[in-house]
Amino acid sequence: MGGAKSSQPVQKPEFYKSKQSFYLPFAWAWFRRRGKAGTISLYPEKETTGGRGRPRIKREVYGMKEHKITRRNFLKVGAAASAVGMLSAAPAAQAAAPAAEAAEENCLDWLFQKPKYIFLFIGDGMGTAQIQSARFYKGTTENNGAITEGELSFTAFPEVGSVTTYDSTSFCPDSASTATSIATGNKTESGVINMCPWTRDVPYETIAEKLHKQKNYKVGVISSVNIDHATPAAFYAHQSSRKNYYQIGVELANSGFEYFAGGEFQKVNGDGTGPNNHEVAAQAGYNVVTTQAGAAALTSGAGKTLIIAEALADGKAMNYAMDAAPGEWQLTDYVRKGMELLDNGRGFFLMTESGKIDWACHANDAAASIHDVLEMSNAVQAAVEFYNNHPNETLILVTADHETGGMAIGYKTTNYDTFLTNLTHQKMSYAKFDSTYVERYIAEKTPFETAMADVKANFGLTLPTDPDAANAGKLLLTDYEVENLRKAYERTLEVGASGQSKMSQQDYELYGTYIPFSMAVCHTINHKSGMDHTTYAHTGAMVNLYAMGVGAEKFRGVFDNTEIYHKLAELTGVQ
């Protein structure tokens, strides 16, 4: 499965013009009541098909651009349309009556419609640099190194907003507090999930819970990291600490949501005195599926389902996209399965987190981040294909909870140049390099030169003394870079399995809480590609929100992350 491109053009709701004069007062009152007397496009946007069959939505409109909607202009447009309609329709008025009535009904449906199918994608840590680096990488690698950007499925969406992310305690928030803001419309402290700040004694109900209870929507939650991690948990759990993993797992089972998929619970056995999280879910009526074949066999009508990915990697999360084996399910596959299991006449809400973008950026692994953004784009494309079949009932939102790593496109030693094609030589994430190679180096005290042969094979970085040095191009290491790598390698062997407990402040500034050698390798290939990071933590940068579908226009402009909840609540009518 995994991210097939759609060849269908993106469809937009049509405007219907028959007998508009009768409905103009009602429509105007509705626009006023809903706060629509601002800037709004009256006509559907043009569509074309982008390269490789991708839908590409151009931000231009038929007939007119955007206009300030006043009562006078609103009535002018309506009166003109009514006059034209009466003159042209008079000879065949009787024959056209049934079609006109149907058009009226469709027009009213469009004016008052609410999204029946809601997709919310959260790229954890996905700031604008993460998105743009993926676009640049895609464009240059698909065009023989040319300086051109590629399109992602969601960067073609017609509406774009900019979102602030700070929480009650910091301008550089964490995922628990930011996901709480998105899910409930409330600020809280870093590390707290859906509880009021400071006292932590009042739970906040989430948009997913309200849609489930008040509107009978089916609900799904997907994450490429642990299913009880902060972001997915913020749609079903209420905890004073994001580290209450077992209790979060119990809340998952008690939520009654119809579909969960992702990595393993972080403390699946709790304190060992009670049932594990799998057993708790099964007792609550969930089908607990732990194999890919079992997940593939699920069909609509399967009932409440919890899928734990079969192929687990670092931290019992799903693999980075660049590390996934051929045929291994990725985010796209779980989105497709979620759509299949959730689709129903009442509607659904599906939250999907690409959590390993954040993990990659914490580790300053630019290539891993890029590949996970590209995989998230594939997952969004699956939702776009669903939208194409339900254009008047579907809303797709793509955003981030915060930015991670302070990613920058541009580096001191490359000046105004970037060489993103260098990143094609990186064959695996830092995490897979650690588990496949570095753990063995530590155990066996492998010589530096031997380790560098593996670095060449998996990252392309080549020592000046290598027999193939003349063919290394821009990945040939300078003496300065070799010395930095050697120091990091020696420090790795010194620290060994004890990890950060023996690391100094200087170590932290150089390598964060990660294995020094792996970080030095990532930094080196990043810098040679023209990329850098400022931190191993989160930043306070604004993030983008991309929207398409019913109510998408509400998400344009600049607003706080709490407004995402409030806009969704207004659109769906939950209290």
Where are these regions (language model features)?
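C-terminal segment of N-terminal export signals and the immediately downstream linker at the start
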Residues: A89-I118
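A glycine- and small-residue-enriched flexible loop/hinge segment at structural boundaries
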Residues: S170, D174-W198
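A post-motif C-terminal structural segment
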Residues: P115-Y117, M126-I131, F136-T180, H229-Q575
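Extracytoplasmic mature domains of secreted/periplasmic and thylakoid-lumen proteins
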Residues: K187-V250
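N-terminal secretory signal peptides
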Residues: S21-W30, G35-N73, V77-L87, A95-A96
